[in-house]
From Swiss-Prot:
Keywords: Cell membrane, GTP-binding, Hydrolase, Lipoprotein, Membrane, Methylation, Nucleotide-binding, Prenylation. It catalyses: GTP + H2O = GDP + phosphate + H(+). This is Ras-related protein rapA. Interacts with ralGDS (only when rapA is in its GTP-bound state). Interacts with the Rap guanine nucleotide exchange factor glfB. It comes from Dictyostelium discoideum. A motif (Effector region) lies at residues 34-42. The gene is rapA. The lineage of its organism: Eukaryota, Amoebozoa, Evosea, Eumycetozoa, Dictyostelia.
Amino acid sequence: MPLREFKIVVLGSGGVGKSALTVQFVQGIFVEKYDPTIEDSYRKQVEVDSNQCMLEILDTAGTEQFTAMRDLYMKNGQGFVLVYSIISNSTFNELPDLREQILRVKDCEDVPMVLVGNKCDLHDQRVISTEQGEELARKFGDCYFLEASAKNKVNVEQIFYNLIRQINRKNPVGPPSKAKSKCALL
């Protein structure tokens, strides 16, 4: 089976760890220094459910920046990672509007999405409970939810692998259909 390409967009407020999660997944390293992203694109080939996949991951600026570019990201993306920080209420509270914007741009209710509560290694600074994340995921229509830590490599691969599975379920790839004959007997 040929290599299938996936366009994944990572969205959320500035400082939630979008770049850290993406770089941890793609390169296997944790970026300690915070350097605000304008836009970075990464490619990684992975195997999911015995299928070779080429991921193009767009790591975006925080939601408070470059809003004009966001509609374009959303239009082209096949799946979305919505990230908040478990140590910040405001990053969590922005996600319902972000999800609504994705649904509006895609003009679809069934968009592959993963909700991620990042920085779960900072449990002593936690202000958003796991239950709050689970409840938001339910409100999003049983969106896949998990907590992650880019620093400690917790659930990082699962974010992207689950998203690939969702995209595959929505757009399955089967064997090419044979062209039907357009011949008619009279």
